[in-house]
Design a protein with these regions (language model features):
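Mixed-charge, low-complexity intrinsically disordered regions
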Residues: 27, 177-256
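A cross-family phosphate/adenosyl-ligand binding-site feature
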Residues: 1-96, 134-168, 172
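Small/polar loops that bind or transfer phosphate-bearing groups
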Residues: 36-37, 104-105, 133, 189
Length: 256
């Protein structure tokens, strides 16, 4: 699957944005997806590409010629597509993507994800989109969309369905199209194994999400295993128990 990410060419005022961008790139690569992005080596864009490439992933950059003239392109990409202008760059990135994510960024990021939302809403393109709302960055956008709905400019059902993903756990569930396990609930795995969910935590270094759970069959033990185990039909024995490597940040965020 191709995941198109829109994000800032600047790094922002807090170092956590760069950490999140790098972890997002690594997450995309480790889950077997191809990253599509704007092709730059600067700011968050460069960190995103570095994370994917260093995790062994495929990265497609789409860069307009005038940025090439300024030598802003990332030199290590799997593929670099050069377009004549920004308009064709945006179209190329939409044509290549299956899922579209808005990471923290500026005016250009808002322009790009807004065009995707409009095209999907008008049934002019297929694909799913979401805002990566790490540390609440896109809460003002969420409030604006709600205001549009309250004032009658967009349908209420559509406004309520726009995804704002606060963590890598939520991103994993969104991409796989599955519900997210929640602390306190009983979870039935595909082999009818029953688990009690105790907690979820993101690994701040890699973006991987882990679930702390207790088995409700056989030996009643606590485990910590990747979220992917709960969202796919794979036996839990295929995933290592990582209780001895607990170093995770809570999903409140790296910026906290």
């Amino acid at each position: 699957m191709n995941i198109t990410v829109y994000l800032g060419s600047r790094s922002g005022n807090r170092s956590c944005y760069a950490d999140y961008a790098y972890a997002l790139g690594a997450w995309i690569a480790r889950h077997g997806h191809t990253l599509v992005y704007g092709g730059s080596r600067t700011g968050l864009m460069g960190k995103l590409a570095d994370g994917a490439l260093q995790a062994g992933g495929q990265v497609i950059g789409v860069e307009p010629q005038f940025f090439m003239d300024e030598e802003l392109q990332h030199e290590g990409l799997t593929k670099l597509i050069v377009t004549p202008d920004m308009t064709s760059r945006k179209q190329q990135m939409m044509d290549l993507g299956d899922i579209f994510l808005a990471f923290p960024g500026g005016i250009g990021t808002l322009e790009e994800i807004s065009q995707v939302m409009s095209q999907v809403k008008l049934h002019q393109m297929e694909g799913r989109f979401a805002f990566l709302d790490f540390d609440g960055y896109y809460q003002p956008m969420k409030a604006l969309i709600q205001q549009m709905s309250d004032e009658g400019f967009v349908d209420e059902d559509w406004a309520d369905a726009v995804p704002f993903l606060p963590s890598f756990a939520a991103l994993t569930a969104f991409v796989l199209g599955r519900d997210l396990p929640r602390p306190g609930e009983t979870w039935r795995h595909f082999k009818n194994h029953m688990y009690r969910i105790l907690d979820l935590a993101d690994d701040a270094e890699t973006g991987e999400t882990y679930v702390v759970y207790k088995t409700l069959y056989g030996e009643y033990r606590d485990f910590i295993r990747p979220l992917d185990m709960f969202l796919s039909e794979v036996d839990h024995d295929k995933y290592p128990d990582v209780r001895q490597k607990w170093r995770f940040e809570k999903t409140a965020g790296l910026c906290s």
